[in-house]
Amino acid sequence: MLETVTDVASFVHYGNTSVFPTADNSSEIIPDGESNISKPHRCLQVLYDDIGTSRVRYWDVMLLIPNVAFLVFLMWKLPSARAKIRLTSSPIFVAFYILVFVVAAVGITRAIVSMTVSTSSAATLIDKVLWEITRFFLLAIELSVIILGLAFGHLESKSSIKRVLAITAVLSLAYSITQGTLEIRFPDKHLSAKDFNIYGHGGRHFWLASSCFFFLVYSLIVILPKTPIRERISLPSKRSFYVYSGILALLNLVQGLGSALLCADIIEGLCCVDVTTFLYFSVFAPLIYVTFLKGFFGSEPKILFSYKSQIDEPEDSDVHLPHTSSSGLGRKDLDRGSYSSTQIDGSGAYLDDVVSGPFGGAHSINSVDSDRWRSINT
């Protein structure tokens, strides 16, 4: 009798179907307020509830809207972004920009396809495969960002970037295959509703192990600048990279705690992993953009062009090889300076210091008398 009561209570707690005692066994079950629950936990229900009579789930819409909004933003910034990317010699910015596009596109594709499938067993399998494909791309990008961020100053060629992407793709594929095998062959019974088996990220135990692993990785990255290793290797100086790592460390910590609660059969842990799953699959791409690309794309194009034209002028000998006398300045040099006010305003004081140097103030550019300039012009 005790076993029968336990089975019924467990099923109605996680499933979506009420179980009522029949006439044969009604005397064996004494209903009370706790065992007569007809609805699953709200944190489980949000994962599969449909909008009205449609087959579209709230969960898919919640994940679709942020990805669509971010993709629209990327398309809006695309013309100016392409113009700025052409000006940089570093392939890392190009790689990051392509990666965020891929993340947004894959997230939208998964949500749309999941909305169109039914609740049959084949549709459930398709939905889980789409989740694994999305997770594969996200993890590949996540690992690539870690490596490229830590080795930002050491990877300057396209071939090295491609090698990093290839390595992270292989690692992500191995992870996704393992997770997908556990998810399809050994689905988590805690995430079953009606005839629809909800995607469980490989089960509670795999979820817990992976969350703890990534929490340790990102926590180590955050504390690296405080360790003696900073004197042996070159670490990123950009503060936003460590903020990014700290956010993901916190995300994996909460996800690990939620998974641990699920392993202890505490259904409230599902609320934690619901929040972390939503944040990861909807906010991860914007986080990469803000961390690594916002500052680069936020600069004005003319500044980049102006900087490039200044460093590429081959005949600007005044800065690199200053004359010891102002009489060495020819008419050609003066004429060229007339249309480059930025260079004059920005470097006039510097040239005064360099030219006057050990020769005193008599030969300073700004202290040359008008008679000397008049004799040069004539």
UniProtKB/Swiss-Prot annotation:
Main location per the UniProt record: membrane
Record localization: Membrane
Transmembrane spans: 61-81, 88-108, 136-156, 164-184, 205-225, 247-267, 278-298
GO cellular component, one term: plasma membrane
Membrane disposition: Multi-pass membrane protein
Alphabetical list of Pfam families matching this protein: Tmemb_40
GO biological process: G protein-coupled receptor signaling pathway
Keywords of the record: Glycoprotein, Membrane, Transmembrane, Transmembrane helix
Family indicated by similarity: Belongs to the UPF0359 family.
Protein name: Transmembrane protein adipocyte-associated 1 homolog
Name of the gene encoding the protein in the UniProt record: tpra1
